Amino acid sequence: MNTNRYTRRQFLERSAAAGALLLAPGRFLAASTPAKRTAADQVTLGKTGLKLSRLGFGTGSNSGQVQHDLGQEQFNSLIRYAYDQGITYFDCAQSYQTFPWLGAAIKGLPREKLFIQSKIGGQPEDILTAIDRHRKVFNTDYVDSMLIHCMVRNNWTDPWKRIMDAFDEAKEKKWIRAKGVSCHSLPALRGARQSDWTEVHLVRVNPQGAFMDGENEAINMTTNPVAPVLDELKSMRAKGRGVIGMKMVGNGTFLQAEDREKAIRFAMSRPELDAVVIGFKSRAEIDEAIGRINAALA
């Protein structure tokens, strides 16, 4: 028997399929062409599985003074504008002057589409009450990511064990969905990377080294070498951690457009970074950041 002979039905089916491809080449091309990456993409935060926009809105420039100076109404408007541009990640902290405002700013937005990250500094006596306060202020059942704020010592995990345990309890209660730490020195950054407790890292990074982590166990606010931080980022990524870059525009000191362009292109070239966060005070700044990120990813 000749098994290579086609039946009339097979011939017609294959002819129809070939004709469909000829009639709709655009559809075939679209399916094979990867989508362009943008600032508004919903990316995955490490192994947490949580989704957030690639670009986040930071509400804590100079401890939130920059955003607070806008006034509540203009702050609300700016948050809504960012959301309309596809930014769904909003970053806050209990110590920011904008902390009492964020709940009103996001009121009415679909909670399931937002990623809210906040931070708690120091060692509150009742850390669960402090975490619950975030839920009340933000008018939400949960905070997507809660960080221990501004660590500077290598062995911070020892004196902060009580705080870490409370974060674990809050996660079990579903008050928070992920936990982590923001660091302001290389020793603290190494300690965070070495700790299996850490799920999310908020890391200062830009190619100029401005306000990046250095070896001093203090809040480093000078220019420091970039390479040691990049080494830590690679190790974090190897562990499946969620990694977010901050100080993208040098704590607001990159006044020249070429410096901002260089920094954003650098960040977008780093596969270790899931997302970045920038503090904004105007629609023009949001538009510029989105434009530069989109161009860098093109």
Model-derived regions, located:
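Active-site groove signature of glycoside hydrolases
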Residues: 138-154
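Short, acidic/polar
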Residues: 69-82, 125-137, 185-190, 259-266
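Conserved, mostly hydrophobic/aromatic
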Residues: 45, 57, 90, 116, ...
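N-terminal binding-site loop/beta-alpha segment at the start of enzyme catalytic domains
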Residues: 2-113, 166, 172, 266, ...
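Active-site mouth loops of central-metabolism enzymes
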Residues: 60-72, 117-125, 254-256
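Beta/alpha (TIM)-barrel catalytic core signal, keyed to glycine-rich beta->alpha loops juxtaposed to Asp/Glu
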Residues: 150-298
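Alpha-helical scaffolding within the catalytic cores
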Residues: 36-43, 99-100, 127-134, 186-187, ...
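Acidic (Asp/Glu)-rich catalytic clusters
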Residues: 47-49, 103-111, 134-141, 193-196, ...
